[in-house]
Curated annotation (Swiss-Prot):
Entry's localization field: Cytoplasm
Name of the encoding gene: glk
Protein name: Glucokinase
PANTHER family xrefs: GLUCOKINASE (PTHR47690:SF1)
GO cellular component: cytosol
Keyword Phosphoprotein set for record: no
Pfam families: Glucokinase
Keywords: ATP-binding, Cytoplasm, Glycolysis, Kinase, Nucleotide-binding, Transferase
GO BP annotations listed: glycolytic process
Organism: Campylobacter jejuni subsp. doylei (strain ATCC BAA-1458 / RM4099 / 269.97)
CDD domains linked: ASKHA_NBD_GLK (cd24008)
Length: 332
């Protein structure tokens, strides 16, 4: 990309679209991101409606290049969100927004790209030693669903971010209690994916299964209330729910670390864990993470980091767009 082309490519439209909220921003210069706004997805019929309201708020700047991270597989032109009603054609959306270039990537691919640029002040380490340089990194995190990605080194300190749907792999129970919880979920849903438990709604599902076992008829409860009751000590059942949630996350994190050979560390993203970070440090997470029989020592050395950065998806999708535009301009 030439200097003149680079200057003319700003501002760039960035979006991180989840099942609950869509975050929008403008990259006004290289690595300078401003005007971050959060829009509830349910308030808008389409993604184009939401974008137009956002851009109108900032004077409808002329934009040629955009990138969206989305909590969904991105295969071909048509996008049907898994955890929301939005469905759209990428090309039709590009035209409706009068963009020259619009790319879409998986939201956790964006999270992974962001991690490649993070400072140590944006991370809290949970156990393990130091990262191995130029080794794969595992990236996952519970939110509306369970996002899963990874960073694979490709030389010169650069990484390729993986795009997948690891949150929808089949859940494997660790002990008798988790077998019971899995059976409860299977009766309700049939196939039980990992994100059935490792998500905001998953926390509620674990609670419901435990309450059912105890013969407790509970009123509808939110993930936030479960966390609050668990941390305050008001509800032993909520505390057990949170313990099991963190233990499950430990097992799944270890599975991903083994699959990728993630000696570069495991990175936990999303808004759930930071809400109870002090509890999480001493929760069953790390013990379960290292409980892998013959590979206990291998996992004990791998550091786990909780990501505290506020908008990693936005910063990650900016990296993806920059990479794409380098190729785009080189071919013009």
């Amino acid at each position: 990309m030439s200097i003149s082309q680079n200057k003319k490519s700003y501002p760039r439209l960035l979006a991180d679209i989840g099942g609950t909220n869509a975050r929008f921003a403008l990259e006004v210069e290289a690595n300078i991101i401003k005007n971050i706004e959060i829009f509830p997805c349910n308030d808008y019929n389409t993604v184009v409606d939401a974008v137009k309201v956002y851009l109108n708020k900032f004077g409808n700047p002329t934009i040629k290049y955009g990138a969206f991270a989305i909590a969904n597989p991105v295969v071909g032109d048509w996008v049907q969100m898994t955890n929301h009603h939005w469905a759209f054609s990428i090309e039709t959306t590009r035209q409706a927004l009068n963009l020259e270039v619009l790319i879409l990537i998986n939201d956790f691919t964006a999270q992974a790209y962001a991690i490649s640029r993070m400072s140590s002040s944006e991370l809290i380490q949970i156990g393990g030693n130091f990262c191995t340089i130029n080794a794969p990194k595992a990236v996952l995190g519970p939110g509306t669903g369970l996002g899963v990605s990874g960073l694979i080194p490709c030389g010169n300190g650069d990484y390729i971010a993986l795009s997948g749907e690891g949150g929808h792999t089949s859940f494997s129970p660790f002990d008798d209690t988790e077998v019971m919880i899995w059976q409860y979920a299977k009766k309700k849903y049939g196939h039980v994916s990992t994100e059935r438990f490792l998500s905001g709604s998953g926390l509620v599902l674990i609670y419901e299964a435990l309450a059912d076992r105890e013969g407790i008829k509970s009123a509808k409860i939110s993930p936030e209330l479960i966390s609050e009751q668990a941390l305050s000590g008001k509800s032993p059942l909520c505390r057990l729910t949170l313990d099991i949630f963190c233990a499950m996350l430990g097992t799944i994190s270890a599975d991903l670390a083994l699959t990728l050979g993630a000696r570069g560390g495991v990175y936990l993203c999303g808004g759930i864990i930071p809400r109870f970070i002090d509890y999480f440090k001493t929760s069953p997470f790390r013990v379960r993470f290292e409980d892998k029989g013959r590979f206990d020592a291998y996992l004990a050395a791998i550091p786990v980091y909780v990501v505290l950065a506020k908008y990693p998806g936005i910063f990650g999708v900016a990296v993806a767009l920059e990479n794409h535009l380098k190729d785009y301009f080189s071919k013009k």
